[in-house]
Design a protein with these regions (language model features):
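Conserved nucleotide-sugar donor-binding subdomain of glycosyltransferases
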Residues: 75-130, 165-188
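Donor nucleotide-sugar binding/catalytic pocket of nucleotide-sugar-dependent glycosyltransferases
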Residues: 142-143, 150, 170-221
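Acidic donor-binding loop of glycosyltransferase active sites
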Residues: 189, 301-318, 329-332
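A charged, aromatic-enriched C-terminal amphipathic alpha-helix characteristic of glycosyltransferases
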Residues: 101, 374-404
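Conserved catalytic-core segment of nucleotide-activated headgroup transferases in glycan assembly
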Residues: 21, 209-305
Length: 411
């Protein structure tokens, strides 16, 4: 079977959530046939060493960036005057319906590729990218819905920290998609979703739950071990280039961490991962008990030293990999209701996880776990087996195989 995988996320490096998902999808698809990678990204955004690794380890057959919103429609006439300003204005004001039309840069490149190479199936990540390809959804085309624009905009409306303008803007964008997106989903041969509840989204009633696999570190995971009873270390891992992570971190630092330190004066909060601007990192570094570590060689030692981890996320789409990783390393996680989405079937609030909404409740959950080592260890021990089972590569690859075999039988 010859498979064309189209994605906007490079499969390397895998310390970023979207990249990790792309790499694991390619790995699962490769168990069913030959996989060609078409990367819908700007080559200038890829550091040369990263691109070299991608070319070395994957069958890269195309690298073309979709046009920016400022390059489409009437915006394109004004863009030469001030590209940066026009792109930002178009991101705020351009109709979101245009995101679901064949892209003037991407579609011709893919048309040429598919004229030269016979593919048995196309797998594409994200509805907007799939529609930009110009490939007929009934090719057969498997749509990998790892996040949805509807969920993203809805989360911005529901975010307790969102201002009036942000909520109104998100509501306007959501209204543009309400009538057109469900019909587009229904045109595809098959849709994969990352969370079981995503099948409740209009248009995805026929979707198959694919989920995501946990990418185990080289050398494997350490055996489940209790946390150090004396540990007062709390950690958050993520890429802070990703806005939901940066906003969630800021919410925790401003509204929750002072309450935790007031009750547990020796508590330490480690912020791990790339993407914080130097001014923001410097400001956080002045917060008592907070340590900005940035990118670290290995996350293992920090999980070993911490009492538990955090996922204070309020916006976005898809699923929070940081929750899965925490349990894989044997540490419980304190989550917001939004970060809990996708884990309802394997983590139970109060028995294997702590879900808290208000700043006061979130702080209380952290304080209680810092003071009760036995409880945090019970939560981790109860959650780890279910998480590793539901998010195993074997289950994930099995769903991929069943889908492609079913499509092949219809051809």
């Amino acid at each position: 079977m010859r498979i064309l995988f189209i994605t906007g996320s490079p499969p390397y490096p895998t310390n970023i959530g979207g990249n990790q998902l792309a790499a694991e999808r390619i790995r699962a698809l490769a168990s069913q046939g030959e996989v060609d990678l078409f990367l819908a990204a700007d080559e200038r955004d890829l550091p040369p060493p990263h691109l070299a690794e991608i070319r070395k380890n994957f069958r890269l057959v195309g690298l073309v960036a979709p046009a920016r919103r400022g390059q489409r429609g009437p915006w394109s006439f004004f863009r030469p005057l001030a590209p940066g300003w026009i792109d930002r204005a178009a991101d705020y004001l351009a109709s979101r319906r245009r995101d679901y039309r064949p892209d003037p840069q991407l579609a011709p490149a893919l048309k040429r590729l598919m004229a030269e190479t016979r593919y048995d199936v196309v797998v594409g990540g994200g509805l907007d990218l799939a529609m930009k390809t110009g490939i007929a959804p009934d090719f057969p085309f498997v749509l990998d819905v790892n996040d949805t624009a509807q969920e993203w905009f809805k989360s911005q409306i529901d975010d307790p920290d969102s201002g009036w303008f942000a909520r109104r803007l998100a509501a306007w964008r959501l209204s543009q998609l309400k009538n057109c997106v469900p019909g587009l989903y229904r045109r595809f041969s098959c849709c994969w979703v990352i969370k079981p509840r995503d099948a409740q989204i209009p248009g995805l009633e026929h979707a198959v739950w694919l989920g995501m696999p946990y990418r185990r570190p080289e050398g494997g995971l350490p055996p489940l071990a209790p946390s150090d009873p004396a540990s007062r270390v709390v950690i958050m891992l993520g890429s802070y280039y990703h806005r939901p992570n940066a906003e969630g971190l800021d919410w925790f630092v401003r509204k929750v961490w002072p309450q935790v330190r007031a009750e547990v004066p020796d508590a330490e909060f480690r912020v791990i991962g790339p993407g914080l601007s130097p001014p923001r990192a410097e400001a956080y570094g002045r917060v008592p008990g907070l340590c900005v570590l940035g990118t670290v060689p290995s996350v293992g030692p920090h999980y070993r030293e911490c009492a538990f981890s955090l996922a204070p996320i309020w916006t976005g789409a898809g699923i929070n990999i940081k929750v899965l990783e925490s349990y894989a390393y044997g540490r419980a996680c304190v989550l917001t209701p939004f970060a809990y989405r996708g884990y309802e079937d394997c983590l139970e609030d109060g028995l294997s996880a702590c879900v808290a909404e208000s700043p006061a409740d979130y702080a209380r959950a952290c304080i209680d776990l810092l003071r009760d080592p036995a409880r945090r260890d019970r939560l981790a021990a109860a959650g780890q087996p279910r998480v590793l089972r539901d998010f195993s590569f074997e289950r994930f690859a099995g769903v991929v195989g069943q889908t492609l075999q079913a499509l092949a039988s219809k051809v």
